[in-house]
Amino acid sequence: MKFAVIVFPGSNCDRDMYHAVKEVAGAEAELVWYTETDKLEGVDGILLPGGFSYGDYLRSGSMASTSDVMHKIREHAAKGKPVLGVCNGFQILTESGLLPGALMRNKHLSFMCHQEELVVEDNQTFFTSLYEKKEVVRFPIAHGEGSYFCDEATLKELQANNQIVFTYKNNPNGSIENIAGIRNKQGNVLGMMPHPERAVEELLGSDDGLKLFKSMIANWRDSYAINA
């Protein structure tokens, strides 16, 4: 499986993501500057890493969401191919309309950087099939605008369609219904605020994130590779 890790001006978790998928999970990966849209041809999975794209001007993820590379990413997603957005990547996905809702300022209005326990709410996804349902995992968080919000109608739709993939055990930022990560209806786009790429080696305090990337690789082999 070949991943493209998209690098925007202000991204700062791109090398963590690259290390996680290539050097730990063993997949093929390339760092792709946001203007190099031609490099997305032939890519199997797209990863939008964390950071502060465009300095978080206007709103977190807002400016990146209008860049040309996002048109390519929409096309990629429309084909059913996987897209993962982490932290700022999640913000970009909501700003671009690939995922519903929005990320707002943390309830205490401060930047948060520590380990958090999450609950795997749905293990029947492209991204979570190697986890157990309701498994508790530990991922780092590092954000100032990570409080997930959506209106009541959208929340009911997320719940009805099993689109809530991860929740916080101890909601650190005020996210509605403790939401830490959601997927689209089709199931091939996942956005989450916690950082699985920073939880792939016990040396860093947890390797719980490794199963997310291995789930992606295993499911790609079972589906896209067979149908290629």
UniProtKB/Swiss-Prot annotation:
InterPro entries: Class_I_gatase-like, PRibForGlyAmidine_synth_PurQ. Residues 3-226 form the Glutamine amidotransferase type-1 domain. It catalyses: N(2)-formyl-N(1)-(5-phospho-beta-D-ribosyl)glycinamide + L-glutamine + ATP + H2O = 2-formamido-N(1)-(5-O-phospho-beta-D-ribosyl)acetamidine + L-glutamate + ADP + phosphate + H(+); L-glutamine + H2O = L-glutamate + NH4(+). SUPFAM superfamilies: Class I glutamine amidotransferase-like. It comes from Oceanobacillus iheyensis (strain DSM 14371 / CIP 107618 / JCM 11309 / KCTC 3954 / HTE831). Its EC number is 6.3.5.3, 3.5.1.2. Pathway: Purine metabolism; IMP biosynthesis via de novo pathway; 5-amino-1-(5-phospho-D-ribosyl)imidazole from N(2)-formyl-N(1)-(5-phospho-D-ribosyl)glycinamide: step 1/2. One of its GO terms (cellular component) is cytoplasm. Part of the phosphoribosylformylglycinamidine synthase complex involved in the purines biosynthetic pathway. Catalyzes the ATP-dependent conversion of formylglycinamide ribonucleotide (FGAR) and glutamine to yield formylglycinamidine ribonucleotide (FGAM) and glutamate. The FGAM synthase complex is composed of three subunits. PurQ produces an ammonia molecule by converting glutamine to glutamate. PurL transfers the ammonia molecule to FGAR to form FGAM in an ATP-dependent manner. The active site is at C87 (nucleophile), H195, E197. Keywords: ATP-binding, Cytoplasm, Glutamine amidotransferase, Hydrolase, Ligase, Nucleotide-binding, Purine biosynthesis. One of its GO terms (biological process) is 'de novo' IMP biosynthetic process. It is found in: Cytoplasm. It holds the Pfam family GATase_5. PANTHER family: PHOSPHORIBOSYLFORMYLGLYCINAMIDINE SYNTHASE SUBUNIT PURQ. Part of the FGAM synthase complex composed of 1 PurL, 1 PurQ and 2 PurS subunits. HAMAP family: PurQ. One of its GO terms (molecular function) is glutaminase activity. This is Phosphoribosylformylglycinamidine synthase subunit PurQ. The gene is purQ. PROSITE patterns: GATASE_TYPE_1 (PS51273).
